[in-house]
Curated annotation (Swiss-Prot):
Homohexamer. Organized in a ring with a central cavity. It comes from the Bacteria. Pfam families: AAA, Lon_C, Lon_lid, LON_substr_bdg. The gene is lon. It is found in: Cytoplasm. It catalyses: Hydrolysis of proteins in presence of ATP. Keywords: ATP-binding, Cytoplasm, Hydrolase, Nucleotide-binding, Protease, Serine protease, Stress response. ATP-dependent serine protease that mediates the selective degradation of mutant and abnormal proteins as well as certain short-lived regulatory proteins. Required for cellular homeostasis and for survival from DNA damage and developmental changes induced by stress. Degrades polypeptides processively to yield small peptide fragments that are 5 to 10 amino acids long. Binds to DNA in a double-stranded, site-specific manner. This is Lon protease. It comes from Malacoplasma penetrans (strain HF-2) (Mycoplasma penetrans). Residues 16-214 form the Lon N-terminal domain. HAMAP family: lon_bact. Belongs to the peptidase S16 family. GO terms for biological process: cellular response to heat; protein quality control for misfolded or incompletely synthesized proteins.
Length: 781
């Protein structure tokens, strides 16, 4: 880009876009190539290129910060012209800058780029720093000494003008500005030289800095002697390689191989890569240059690209506002109060300790209850990048940790790939379906996960392909699972389990009303007054067309209605419609599901149990009857082993206490008892139907009708104790929905009644029981 005039404000202030570098200091009259990869920098370059304007190049104070604030940037920089040397496939640039003059940044501001994606970048109004080029005789001698001493270093610089190798009065200020680039000065020293307007004082500072460097070299001389042999060998190799390169260049036979190598070296020198990574990259670059065939070159180049593109210092700033996190979670997710409370507590401790170490969150719950979207909301709330790896069905350890480079087509594992995609060292990293990890002869991925999730080890994670330690300690890992019992025990030990239960119908209604309908209307290009849903219509969809723990089927049903309505809009010129129960039936046709309701008539031997299912809960009718026989018991209804045992325990308890219950003990040898649980196509298991089975048997034997509005749940022992069960919330809601408002449950489950919505609790009677006598006294006396 040619040197063009920059914009001026109404007050004649000069304005230019600002490129912030990681410790690279520019000077007037110099020329250097820089790799540009940060989004802000790319946006600033594109804007300046489009407007054909020069830029201010200035360094940030701390090179390790990925996104410096205004206060973390030096206020003196260099106005530069620039040309784009190369644009890389990932959108980054190689830019050659030419320094024009020293400038003082008066005011640094931000603005957004043009185009669809708005990226903020810095611009500034600035003023030129007037330079004093007068020299005393002693300083004239000093510049001659410096030029003579460091002539080779200057000559080795890629863009140093050969015409300036001979010192003259006209070019001495140019030589002084090139010297800090040729010599190994610290960032602070380089910035001091940029901010100094006096040529005489700049020479004095350079003399001072080089003397300090010489003292340091003298201290290290003994160490240098010990490695002279190896160094001499390396210098010889370097010399010969450069000779070959020079000959090829002279013949016009220079290939892109050398250009690639030099570009990689520049990128490594100009960025704060960890020392062991720098060493490995430079070693691989040497192999790249000496590779003799295209396959070898391609493999080396691919490996270097993976190694150099991984994030090592880039990070997003941490968010310290719990209120912001809470707002995002509440806006994106209805209900789940206890889950959100646990997440807030977990994040609060991380924020306070400023440490990434600690247990890993694992969200456990049925499909569709919002585990993945919760993880995405956490990333959004913390303003962090979000990446996801699906672990379902993974059986090969190499999928996680990569294949060794000796294999054809070797690549890094999914962890390294995801980190490269994130582009920062501290993303939110979702490990989806961790309970579905498998294992076979190729290895055990669950064991490989231990290195990744253990905070004491994951700062040295080793991928088989990368072969260098990589730090995962800044990553916020979140795992998800459907079934907690399927998580391998060593992994389970490292996880903090947060359980998400299935949504109630009221919760599903609120989610559909406040989230799903709005989302689907936007997707279908419909306005909110074109298609409206009543509460009755949405409730009918939930009850009669879906049976699930989450809301995915509800979303599909609403989307189906929206599609069919759009078709009618096009064909029948229908302008708007309100969707109630009848409209739902019209669009979705025949109902798919029904929920179990209480019987209208009372009958001996029939009792309502309460079932917990993956779709929430349901009433579980239990029937018992007997006929003359020889004391046999028949059990039907597709009952699994545990529930069959519950039938036998219930019968054993009744037999033992027959006299107390007013039953002749002899009758058990004279009848055959039959226990049946309807809906035989559905497998049923668990011990929680114990007291319902006992009541059904007693009701049949005593010929006592149990009111159909009664439902019960609880495990029973042979001594008549009623033991704690799970799924209190789901069972209670389903019982109320089915018409049962008089519920018996174990005393020990009292602690879970707070989970039951108030609108349900206020309309039912709950009897808490310690022993079966409490049930018997209420129903049979």
């Amino acid at each position: 880009m040619n040197n063009k005039k920059n914009e001026k404000t109404t007050n004649n202030k000069e304005i230019a876009n600002v490129l912030v570098t990681r410790g690279i200091v520019f000077y007037p009259n110099t020329k250097i190539r820089i790799e540009i990869g940060r989004e802000k920098s790319i946006a600033a370059i594109n804007d300046s290129k489009e407007k054909k304007q020069n830029m201010i190049v200035v360094s940030q104070e701390n090179p390790s910060i990925d996104s410096p604030s205004k206060n973390e940037i030096f206020t003196v920089g260099t106005l530069c012209s620039f040309e784009i040397d190369n644009k890389h496939p990932d959108g980054s640039y190689s830019i050659i800058f030419t320094g024009i003059k020293r400038v003082k940044i008066n005011k640094l501001s931000e603005k957004a780029s043009d185009g669809e994606i708005k990226t903020k970048f810095f611009y500034a109004d600035y003023s030129e720093i007037e330079e004093d080029t007068k020299l005393s005789k002693s300083n004239e001698e000093a510049i001659k000494d410096l030029h003579a001493k460091f002539e080779n270093e200057l000559n080795n610089l890629t863009f140093f003008p050969k015409k300036d190798l001979a010192l003259s009065k006209e070019n001495r200020h140019t030589i002084v500005d090139w010297l800090p680039i040729a010599l190994k000065f610290s960032l602070e020293e380089k910035q001091q030289l940029l901010e100094e307007p006096s040529l005489s004082k700049r020479i004095e500072k350079i003399l001072s800095f080089t003397i300090d460097e010489r003292v340091s070299q003298k201290i290290d001389s003994e160490i240098s002697k010990k490695i002279n042999t190896n160094l001499s060998k390396q210098q010889k190799e370097f010399y010969l390689r450069e000779r070959v390169r020079a000959i090829k260049e002279e013949l016009g036979d220079i290939s892109s191989k050398e250009d690639d190598a030099e570009s990689i070296r520049d990128r490594v020198r100009n960025n704060p890569y960890p020392e062991h990574i720098k060493k490995r990259i430079l070693s691989e670059v040497n192999k790249l240059e000496s590779s003799s065939n295209s396959n070898e070159y391609s493999m080396s180049k691919t490996y270097i690209d993976w190694l150099i593109d991984l994030p090592y210092w880039q990070k997003t700033d941490d968010v310290d506002s719990l209120a912001d996190v809470e707002n995002v979670l509440n806006n994106n997710h209805y209900g789940l109060e206890k889950v959100k409370e646990r997440i807030i507590e977990y994040l609060a401790v991380r924020m306070k300790s400023k440490s990434a170490k600690g247990s890993i969150i694992c969200l456990v719950g049925p499909p569709g209850v919002g585990k993945t979207s919760l993880a995405q909301s956490i990333a959004e709330a913390l303003k962090k990048k979000f990446v996801k790896v699906s672990l379902g069905g993974m059986r090969d350890e190499a999928e996680l940790k990569g294949h060794r480079k000796t294999y054809i087509g070797a690549m890094p594992g999914r962890i390294i790939k995801a980190m490269s995609k994130a582009g920062v060292v501290n993303p939110v990293f979702l490990l989806d379906e961790i309970d579905k990890l498998g294992s076979d002869h190729k290895g055990d991925p669950a064991s490989a996960m231990l290195d990744i999730l253990d905070p004491e080890q994951n700062n040295r994670f080793s991928d088989n392909y990368i072969e260098e330690d990589y730090d995962l300690s800044n990553v916020l890992f979140i795992a998800t699972a459907n079934y907690e019992e399927n998580i391998p025990e060593p992994l389970h030990d490292r996880l903090e389990i947060i359980r998400l239960s299935s949504y109630t119908e009221n919760e599903k209604l609120s989610i559909a009303k406040n989230y799903l309908v709005k989302k689907i209307l936007v997707e279908s290009a419909l306005k909110k007054d074109e298609l409206k849903f009543t509460d009755d219509g949405l409730s009918y969809i939930i009850k009669r067309y879906t049976r699930e723990a989450g809301v995915r089927e509800v979303e599909r049903a609403i989307r189906q209605i929206a599609r069919k309505f759009v078709v009618r809009q096009q064909k029948e010129k229908l302008t708007s419609q309100t969707i109630g129960v009848e409209e739902v039936k019209y669009y979705l046709k025949k109902e798919i599901y029904d929920y179990t309701k209480k019987d209208k008539e009372y009958m001996p031997g029939v009792v309502n149990g309460m079932a917990y299912t993956t779709a929430g809960g349901d009433l579980l009718p239990i029937e018992a009857t007997f006929a003359p026989g020889k004391g046999k018991i028949e059990i039907t209804g597709n009952l699994k082993e545990t529930m069959k045992e519950s039938v036998n325990v219930a019968l054993g308890y009744v037999k033992t206490n027959a006299v107390k219950f007013g039953i002749d003990p002899k009758i058990f040898g004279e009848i055959d008892l039959h226990v049946h649980v309807p809906s035989g196509g559905i497998p049923k298991d668990g011990p929680s139907a114990g007291i319902a089975l006992t009541t059904a048997i007693l009701s049949a034997l005593k010929n006592v009708k149990i009111p159909s509005n009664v439902a019960m749940t609880g495990e029973i022992t042979l001594r008549g104790r009623v033991l704690i069960i799970g799924g209190v919330k789901e069972k209670t809601i389903s019982a109320y929905r089915g018409g049962a408002n008089d519920i018996f449950m174990p005393k020990e489950d009292e602690r879970y009644l707070d989970d039951v919505p108030e609108e349900v609790r206020s309309k039912i009677k709950i009897t808490l029981v310690d022993t079966y006598d409490d049930v018997y006294n209420r129903l049979f006396k």
